[in-house]
Amino acid sequence: LVHPIALADYRDFRPVITGACASFGHPLPRDVPPSAEALAWLGLPAPDRGEPIRDGVIRGSSGWAAARTGGGAVSVFVRAGSYTSRPGQIDPLQLDVRFGSREVVTDAGTFSYNSPPPWRNALASGAVHNGPILDDEEPGIRGPRFLWYVWPSARIVSAEMEGEEAVIVAEIPDRVRRTVRVMADRVIVRDEVLAPNAWRARIRWLLHPNADPSSVRVEGGSRLVEAREGEPAGWFSPTYGERAASRYVEVEREVTPGMRIVTEILGFASKGRFHSQGE
């Protein structure tokens, strides 16, 4: 294992950002506190301070897009890659949502490659990610160990700001399209089935263990499912070898022409009306 350069939480990336900025002479955004521990381990002076992180959208050539709105109040990350080397997980159209520093909708993580069934690489399947699943068919086919028979494939169609809102469109070609609208206090997700012969669509929104289930609302109704021992769905792994019971919001629909599944993700518990049009 790599020796940690700070005692921060595993998912706290400030030490890495500090170390990278100090090592490569890049200004550290002034709204990111520098990690004194990282600098001490690396024996480097503190980097210069730069402009604060601003709202906006960025996308990567490997098939991902990230957006930030509301002065950091809301941030999302969308995965929609086409692979040139072996995939790690089946996660096309996976969406992660944070409100400030709080995770609400999250990725399941890894947990373990080698544990006894059902935990041997169990969190790699599409069924435990929140990309839409059509007709119970995984968007990729795994073989034994790290072998793949069919690689998952998706793409970012567009990622741009529309005024103060960010809009990311991603799709599994000829299967499903996901449109993510990021506002200052909520995220609206519209999933549209493209496959002409599909008959059923399912989405499972895994919640962070600390997230309020009422933060995720699906137009037309959904059900909340608690994690159960022996079943991978509903579990969250913050780091390798660790797992915690959580819950997921599940929606299943019979596919009809022009059907869309609309989900609203909030940074607060709400019993108000559903804002399906991003009002």
Model-identified regions with their sequence ranges:
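Short, surface-exposed beta-strand-loop junctions and turns on beta-sheet-rich folds
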Residues: 82-85, 111-113, 195-197
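Catalytic Cys-His active-site segments of thiol-dependent hydrolases/isopeptidases
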Residues: 105-110
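Carbohydrate-active enzyme catalytic cores, enriched for enzymes
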Residues: 1-104, 159-163
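CBM-like, beta-strand-rich accessory domains located in the C-terminal region of large
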Residues: 7-33, 38-41, 115-279
